[in-house]
Amino acid sequence: ILTFAIFTALLVTAAVHMPKKSGNTVCIDAGHGGYDVGATNGERYEKDDNLRLAKAVEAELKARGINTIMTRSDDTYVSLEDRCKTANKKKADLFISLHRNSADSGCGFEIWTLKNSPPDDLLLAENIMDALGEVGLSKNRGVKGGIAGNGNNYYVNKNTDMPSCLAEMGFITDDGDNALFDKNLQSYAAAIADA
């Protein structure tokens, strides 16, 4: 019985941390774009940081044999509805939306799911946050669930048909977070791909 219990525990642990399988499809959403610049810090625009990271994540996933879908691959505006339609129509297995946060003061990285998210959404978000933490963050602000009826129940999480999360990759308004983002961009992309 003890042997069976240990074997079962090992199987459960392996399943929780199993990497994405070759042949699966991940939809990568670079937030904002075109006239929608997102948050800013001087001449630094969130839309540009999101796209740089999205392209790096795409390359890392492809190197692992994982199919990718980009909601945008250049500086164009794509509506939230069209982002979700792309992921749903192409039957992505996972959806991750990449963003930068902003505030008068504040730093750190956080990942959002829906309030009362299905276990797969939470697992995806927790695995990504753990992997990013291993690279290094100014502050781990954790995995957060949106509150029904408010803006933090992000449209893309609500309207995609697969496990999804929205990652806020540091505060664009914080110089320390920007330095980490620039220094670790490739490592963050690899961490997301491995999560």
Task: State what each model feature region is.
Residues 20-42, 96:
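Catalytic-core environment of secreted peptidases
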Residues 1, 13-17, 21-24, 48-195:
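Active-site-proximal helix/loop segments of hydrolytic enzymes
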